[in-house]
UniProtKB/Swiss-Prot annotation:
Subunit organization: Component of the Rhino-Deadlock-Cutoff (RDC) complex, composed of rhi/rhino, del/deadlock and cuff/cutoff. Interacts with rhi/rhino; this interaction is indirect and is mediated by del/deadlock. Interacts with del/deadlock (via C-terminal); this interaction is direct. Interacts with Rat1.
Recorded family membership: Belongs to the DXO/Dom3Z family.
Protein name per Swiss-Prot or TrEMBL: Protein cutoff
Organism from which the protein derives: Drosophila melanogaster
A GO MF term: piRNA cluster binding
Compartments reported by the entry: Cytoplasm; Nucleus; Chromosome
GO BP term (any one): snoRNA transcription by RNA polymerase II
The UniProt record lists the keyword Aminoacyl-tRNA synthetase: no
Entry GO terms, CC: chromosome; cytoplasm; cytosol; nucleus; perinuclear region of cytoplasm; Rhino-Deadlock-Cutoff Complex
Keywords: Chromosome, Cytoplasm, Nucleus
Function (record text): Involved in the piRNA pathway in germline tissues. Part of the Rhino-Deadlock-Cutoff (RDC) complex that stimulates piRNA biogenesis from chromatin regions corresponding to dual-strand, but not single-stranded, piRNA clusters. Promotes transcription of long piRNA precursors by preventing termination at canonical poly(A) sites. As part of the RDC complex, is recruited to chromatin enriched in histone modification H3K9me3 and might contribute to complex interaction by binding nascent transcript nucleic acid chains. Associates with chromatin upon exposure to homologous piRNA.
Observed phenotype of the null mutant: Females exhibit severely reduced fecundity. Defects in germline cyst development and result in ventralized eggs as a result of reduced Grk expression. Increase in the transcript levels of two retrotransposable elements, Het-A and Tart. RNAi-mediated knockdown in germline cells leads to decresed production of dual-strand cluster derived piRNAs.
Top-level lineage group: Eukaryota
Amino acid sequence: MNSNYTILNIRAHSWAEKDNLVFPTITKPVSNGWFAWSPIGQFEPNSQKVPYVVVPPSIKFPISLRYKDSPPKLEKKPNIFLDNMLQYIESSSYMYVMVRNNQQAQLNANIVCTSEVLELMMCAPYEKKTGWSLGVTRYRNTMYICRIDVEQPDPIDQDNLKRAMQEFWLRNLRTHCVFENGIKMHQHNQSSEEHLRFHGVFSFDLNGNRVLFDSPVLAEMPSTTLNGSALSWVDLQIRPMFMSRLDWPEHNRTEALKWWVKCFLLGIESLYIARRDENAHVHNIEKTLVRDLWKSCEKDWSPTVCANFMIYLLNCISQVMAPIDCPSTVYLFQFDASQGTVSYKGLRGRNQYTFVSDWFRMMLDDHTNDMCKTPNLQTMSSIV
């Protein structure tokens, strides 16, 4: 650990008995809206191209997920940080921007982040291999949190290679099972990178703090075609058909835990699990209730431990960030998976990790002026 980092008084891999007994107060997530990324990673306020999961008929199985050319590599994701989420907030500012007694426009959320941030925190108690880094900015009483890759992953590391293969299989599976409003999304000569990525925006109250976050989502194809019906979110994952008694606990603590955490955060009640053989052929896809997934793993991990660690870590981060009120200052929080420790350092003012853009700060300033001139706008924003 670098000497300029300070270690938090929190340990992911050890917890008190109460952390396994009392589940914290977390309200059911609310779906607030959605947006899409363009093929080049830019925000598009698009609510029409919803991706639906449709299981192919039995005659289509087995489905081959094998690569035809070069082996897959870890997907390099664009460094968009929170850009698209902030643009969504700006496009729906009447829902999220308000003016308090200090006559400054601010968000009606204590935390803005991606679902990945919350997933990493909840999985940390059982993560022993892969560390991560988060960037945190606090501005006008809201913390903005996103994942920041301080170090590049080792391309020849076996865990990274395994993750790259799993991501490739999942992208390939989606070309067979994901449809855009009833129309197949991907042609065989196109990759998933050439299409929109659909994200939902969610919120919940976490021990009295409102958390606003986005996540990539898939929808359940409705049984009827009634207009205006609420979307029902699902998930699509892959697991081996056959695993040994030693393989199952490892799978449950890693892959299955991540599936459950994502479903919990988004309020997903069921997911589709594709079962593949050793030759990367999917033989069937089963719909599984999320509560049944948890019951099958209850000896390997505790959802109460996961949720409580997320609460503790967010509280620690809040205490560190309490004196900060600057859109450019970023604090880096690093999780050491081998030790189960979290450390941090602050980078004051504009720096290489600054991710809250000037346009967002200017947008809040503009709303401050507009709302002070028009009291009705202030009232409407405060009650949303």
